[in-house]
């Protein structure tokens, strides 16, 4: 299916690109999330008429995400969990726990934005993580896990 991207999509393209994707990806994800439209002649004409407005919105989103990232960089978030004598946690600290801790610190972040390449954290200590605030903006934070 041919679609017009209404915003930047990772590994697919930028605003205004016309790309071919599988039908299910377009119908079930891109179109409902308002990231894309079908590439019909009418939709293309409408997009070209609104291109400047959409580019302005995309630039505003990027600027807002960059401002939040500037404030968030270097933030240390502390999470308390029960742990054994050897420093291993009873359970783990995942994306949702870190998103809740960031919310308590005054940052509104979706749990899917927290990047944990090694998976959930299962030990006491300090761990550097990235938070994806926008497709082009990453904030670096440190998660400190302490024993209760």
UniProtKB/Swiss-Prot annotation:
One of its GO terms (molecular function) is structural constituent of ribosome. The keyword Phosphoprotein does not apply. Disulfide bonds: none annotated. One of its GO terms (biological process) is translation. GO terms for cellular component: ribonucleoprotein complex; ribosome. It comes from the Bacteria. Pfam families: Ribosomal_L9_C, Ribosomal_L9_N. Keywords: Ribonucleoprotein, Ribosomal protein, RNA-binding, rRNA-binding. PANTHER family: 50S RIBOSOMAL PROTEIN L9. NCBIfam families: L9 (TIGR00158). Binds to the 23S rRNA. Belongs to the bacterial ribosomal protein bL9 family. This is Large ribosomal subunit protein bL9. It comes from Dechloromonas aromatica (strain RCB). The lineage of its organism: Bacteria, Pseudomonadati, Pseudomonadota, Betaproteobacteria, Rhodocyclales. The gene is rplI.
């Amino acid at each position: 299916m041919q679609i017009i991207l209404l915003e930047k999509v990772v590994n697919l393209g930028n605003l205004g690109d016309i790309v071919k994707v599988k039908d299910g990806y377009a119908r079930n994800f891109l179109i409902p999330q308002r990231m894309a439209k079908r590439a019909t002649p009418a939709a293309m004409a409408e997009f070209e008429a609104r291109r400047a407005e959409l580019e302005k919105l995309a630039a505003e989103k990027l600027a807002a995400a960059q401002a939040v990232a500037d404030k968030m960089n270097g933030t240390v978030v502390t999470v308390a969990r029960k742990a054994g004598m050897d420093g291993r946690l009873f359970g783990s600290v995942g994306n949702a726990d870190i998103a809740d801790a960031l919310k308590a610190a005054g940052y509104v972040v979706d749990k899917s934005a927290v990047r944990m390449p090694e998976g959930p954290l299962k030990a006491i200590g300090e761990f550097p993580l990235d938070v994806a605030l926008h497709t082009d903006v990453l904030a670096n934070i440190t998660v400190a896990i302490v024993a209760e």
